Amino acid sequence: MPYIPHTPNDTKEMLAAIGAQDIQDLFDEIPASLQYAGFQNIPAGINEMEMLKEAQNQAQKNRNGICFIGAGCYEHHIPAAVWDIASRGEFLTAYTPYQAEASQGTLQLLYEYQTMICELTGMEVSNASMYDGATALAEAVLMAVRLNKHSKTNRVLIAGTVHPFYRETIETIVRNQHIEVITLPFDEQQGITDLGSLNQYTGEDITALVIAQPNFFGCLEQVDKMTSWAHHNKTISVACINPTSLALLKPPGSWGEHGVDIVCGEGQPLGSPMASGGPYFGFLSTRMAHVRQMPGRIIGRTVDKDGKTGFSLTLQAREQHIRRAKATSNICTNQGLLVTAATIYMSLLGPEGLSQVATQCHQNTHELITALTQIEGVEQAFKASFFHEALIKLNQPVQSVLQQLADAGIAGGYAPEQHYPQLANTLLVCATEVRTAEDIAKYAKTLKAIMSKRGA
């Protein structure tokens, strides 16, 4: 194979130059008990054809199970054209060009992305993306604190139904910024925020309210009432949403009497594969009145001196180009490649295609829950309506059930007990548009056998 850097003679000369007998001498300071002996069994180098065959043999060992896990990362069908286009050399770059205006194609794509996000969320302006959904929400909280000039306490109410990892990220980022985070309890019968717990803060100095839709349990919150409460209480409202759901649900810009102030979320469902947690991208949009406090880059459309349309970075005085203490955020880049894929994904599907995806997700999950709750020992945990994932309760230890499902080639869901101790032996399950009737039937049949085995 070409490009192997060191020949045996090269290695011999370098070892002689430093007075070593062999490469192992370079690691002689590491005790033998701490050295892994298995590397000695690695064979000598092979040619490209042999290597490809070995890689194929290893790949055949992978288990491609049926996935019913959601909890923030979702398996959706990605049209082949999405990554075929996104991988073109014009788009697949290491970083945003420092002379950004030289890359008009990239800037136009980001501008189109911003337009699509605004159409989805019902807001007026979007940035060019954030790191992921969790950091987008944390930045939205910081933005809300900057925006609320009436508040003197910097207290932020966060629904307990917001993704627990997102809440942990917020706590980490605001910990030393004199911001108090208050978690609202949820109704353990309905699976949504207890409005009574929210109403007890009426008239108090609350800086921001964070609402998830759908929430971590897949349930649909009473977003109109929560948003209107925030408006009447002079509180900045922040919506953390799943973009797929917006093809069916009311956009946050229309919640309540006046809509929310900031919308953010995880962009992974828009054309990014599940990949061990990333890379993904976060999106953030807001009202034009708040644009100077919005973190991240913004692409604007303008006209040059010859009257030709052009695209450029705009409102840079609120970003990292100014003194660090004056900038809106320490985040100074965007997830351009993932945004490219998302823009292509949304363009290829269009409004009708996105609606079909959301509808199929909704129907599949309802069919899944119907099938699973017919099994003795399985019941739906919450009564509230849900979008494309829901919580079921088992009368057996959930980890044992998950292991047996895995042995049968089924990733059965996510157990939220580590975040919510009161939800012992529950399972968060999801069925997107890629799950078939056969997949759902196999899950139900396998789970029924597992549950009946315990009862026998």
UniProtKB/Swiss-Prot annotation:
One of its GO terms (biological process) is glycine decarboxylation via glycine cleavage system. The keyword DNA damage does not apply. It comes from Legionella pneumophila (strain Lens). The glycine cleavage system is composed of four proteins: P, T, L and H. In this organism, the P 'protein' is a heterodimer of two subunits. The lineage of its organism: Bacteria, Pseudomonadati, Pseudomonadota, Gammaproteobacteria, Legionellales. Signal peptide: none annotated. NCBIfam families: PRK00451.1. The keyword Oxidoreductase applies. Belongs to the GcvP family. N-terminal subunit subfamily. It comes from the Bacteria. The glycine cleavage system catalyzes the degradation of glycine. The P protein binds the alpha-amino group of glycine through its pyridoxal phosphate cofactor; CO(2) is released and the remaining methylamine moiety is then transferred to the lipoamide cofactor of the H protein. It catalyses: N(6)-[(R)-lipoyl]-L-lysyl-[glycine-cleavage complex H protein] + glycine + H(+) = N(6)-[(R)-S(8)-aminomethyldihydrolipoyl]-L-lysyl-[glycine-cleavage complex H protein] + CO2. Keywords: Oxidoreductase. This is Probable glycine dehydrogenase (decarboxylating) subunit 1. It is an enzyme of class 1 (oxidoreductase). Its EC number is 1.4.4.2. InterPro entries: GcvPA, GDC-P_N, GDC_P, PyrdxlP-dep_Trfase, PyrdxlP-dep_Trfase_major, PyrdxlP-dep_Trfase_small. GO terms for molecular function: glycine dehydrogenase (decarboxylating) activity.
